[in-house]
């Protein structure tokens, strides 16, 4: 096979759900283009969670994991799995020893901030409690700045997570000093006012004060405020960060920590910056932040983007703000700089409080740009991400999710019709994980806002090869399939297999 171009459309959070479920936003929306391509073009299903994507067995997938597996053509051991394995001997880590030594010398307090959640997408609470306990054993006072989840977990699971966390730190000089919903603490869409609200609570204890974490959470629940949206709050007599203190950023996923880390380091326009002695992060967040980390990044060679570049071919990555990092940084397996002949287009996400208020997000603007680029026939590989199914799925709003599905479906029809105009072009429609196909948790009688364990679709429209047969596989099989379609030899590093039978 020697097609001239491949358009890879990643419908973020669009999984294979139960077709007749009243909680499946896809089937309930009756998207016409989707129904047509599902019935008329070659299709298979891909595993997007657990050990098939380098996560612990039974762990939900996510966008970072999904995009890395898609581009690398191999199962990538993920941060959660790696840290689970290595944190048992973390006291031998050179950067941690240096961090502890500095705190001891200055008699400083260790400020650990991160998502206290068992979701395993951005962090894991057991990693945070392990670090806190190990540092506390050096007779260092530890305070926790707890971010609450409710997005990769059930909306009201924060209380249980905090209870378990406090049980695990009991007996050491460790306490929770501030609490903040991730909506504020972990913004990645340049809503700096949210990040600043969290920062001011952490740095200066400038926020509403509450005496007890559990009663704070209960009060919010009673007012129908779920974990994600709890406003930054100071607990007890916490006074803020001092010059002698150290800061440890405990989330292992980078994209939702960059804004907070940037303010902490004075790398934004925000001028009131608290001084501290040392800083450490769980993983590398961003090159220009220059924060020492506990777990340096793994390096990958012969990823899909690299192979396209090495063959002197052009490629395009396009997404709106919420998923831009996924089609660039994560799709390049942690490489920030574009490859040679790699063009990137960022479409701003709408400035709304939550995306159920504008479920179409910026999909139509993205599609207008995408269609023009397909018609230009400049690119051998185009990677596009539609954020709507995931971002609106996370709100738990079924009606909005159906609107998001229909908006993406309308865009997909435009993309398909454009690809049909081009000779020797292929359209692949797939997803990185599930979400929008399950909008309610009957067991817990609550909206389902997290990702799912469902497989994801893989549909291919080849302009001149309608008898193509596909086999089921996993996300790491996508890159080898694309290379086969382009007539490019798969490198040895890609252990995935082409889905084409």
UniProtKB/Swiss-Prot annotation:
Cofactor: Mn(2+)
Chain positions recorded as Mn(2+) 1 binding sites: 390, 394, 451
Coiled coil: none
Residues annotated to bind Mn(2+) 2: 12, 63, 432-433
CDD domains, A to Z: iPGM
Catalysed reaction equations from the record: (2R)-2-phosphoglycerate = (2R)-3-phosphoglycerate
Binding residues for substrate: 122, 151-152, 182, 188, 253-256, 323
Keyword Manganese part of the UniProt annotation: yes
MF GO annotations: manganese ion binding; phosphoglycerate mutase activity
Keyword field: Glycolysis, Isomerase, Manganese, Metal-binding
Active site: 63
Disulphide linkage map: none
Similarity comment text for this entry: Belongs to the BPG-independent phosphoglycerate mutase family.
Entry-linked NCBIfam families: pgm_bpd_ind
Stated name of the protein: 2,3-bisphosphoglycerate-independent phosphoglycerate mutase
């Amino acid at each position: 096979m020697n097609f001239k171009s491949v358009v890879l459309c990643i419908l973020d959070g669009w999984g294979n759900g139960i077709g007749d479920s009243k909680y499946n936003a896809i089937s309930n929306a009756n998207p016409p283009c989707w129904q047509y391509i599902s019935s008329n073009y070659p299709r298979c299903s891909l595993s997007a969670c657990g050990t098939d994507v380098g996560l612990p067995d039974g762990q939900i997938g996510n966008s970072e994991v999904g995009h890395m597996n898609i581009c690398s053509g191999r199962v990538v051991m993920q941060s959660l799995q790696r840290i689970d394995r290595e944190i048992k001997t973390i006291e031998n880590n050179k950067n941690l020893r240096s961090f502890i030594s500095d705190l001891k010398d200055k008699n400083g307090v260790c400020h650990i901030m991160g998502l206290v959640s068992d979701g395993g997408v951005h962090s894991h609470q057991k990693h945070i409690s392990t670090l806190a306990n190990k540092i506390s054993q050096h007779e260092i006072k530890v305070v926790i700045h707890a971010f609450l989840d409710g997005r990769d977990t059930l909306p009201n699971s924060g209380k249980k997570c905090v209870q378990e966390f406090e049980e695990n730190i009991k007996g050491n000089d460790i306490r929770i000093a501030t609490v903040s919903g991730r909506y504020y603490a972990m913004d990645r869409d340049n809503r700096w006012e949210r990040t600043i609200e969290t920062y001011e609570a952490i740095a200066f204890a400038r926020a509403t004060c509450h005496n007890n974490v559990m009663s704070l959470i209960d009060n919010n629940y009673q007012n129908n405020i779920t974990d994600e949206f709890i406003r930054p709050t100071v607990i007890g007599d916490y006074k803020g960060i001092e010059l002698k203190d150290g800061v440890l950023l405990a989330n292992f996923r980078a994209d939702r920590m960059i804004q907070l880390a940037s303010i902490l380091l004075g790398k934004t326009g925000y001028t009131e910056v608290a001084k501290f002695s040392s800083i450490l992060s769980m993983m590398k967040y961003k090159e220009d932040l220059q924060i020492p980390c506990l777990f340096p990044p793994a390096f990958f060679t012969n990823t899909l983007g690299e192979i396209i570049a090495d063959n002197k071919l052009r490629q395009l990555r396009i997404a709106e703000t919420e998923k831009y990092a996924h089609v660039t940084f994560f799709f390049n397996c942690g490489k920030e700089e574009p490859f040679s002949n790699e063009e990137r287009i960022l479409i701003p996400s709408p400035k709304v409080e939550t995306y159920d208020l504008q479920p179409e997000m910026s999909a139509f603007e993205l599609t207008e740009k995408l269609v023009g680029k397909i018609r230009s026939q400049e690119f051998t590989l185009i990677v596009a991400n539609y954020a709507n199914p995931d971002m609106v799925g996370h709100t738990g709003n079924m009606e909005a999710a159906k609107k998001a599905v229909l908006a993406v479906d309308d865009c997909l029809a435009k993309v398909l019709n454009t690809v049909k105009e081009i000779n020797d072009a292929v359209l692949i429609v797939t997803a990185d994980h599930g979400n929008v196909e399950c909008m309610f948790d009957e067991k817990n009688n609550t909206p389902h806002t997290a990702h799912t364990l469902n497989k994801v679709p893989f549909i291919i429209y080849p302009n001149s090869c309608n008898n193509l047969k596909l086999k089921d596989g996993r996300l790491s099989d996508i890159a080898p399939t694309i290379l086969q379609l382009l007539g490019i030899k798969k490198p040895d590093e890609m252990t995935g297999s082409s889905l084409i039978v």
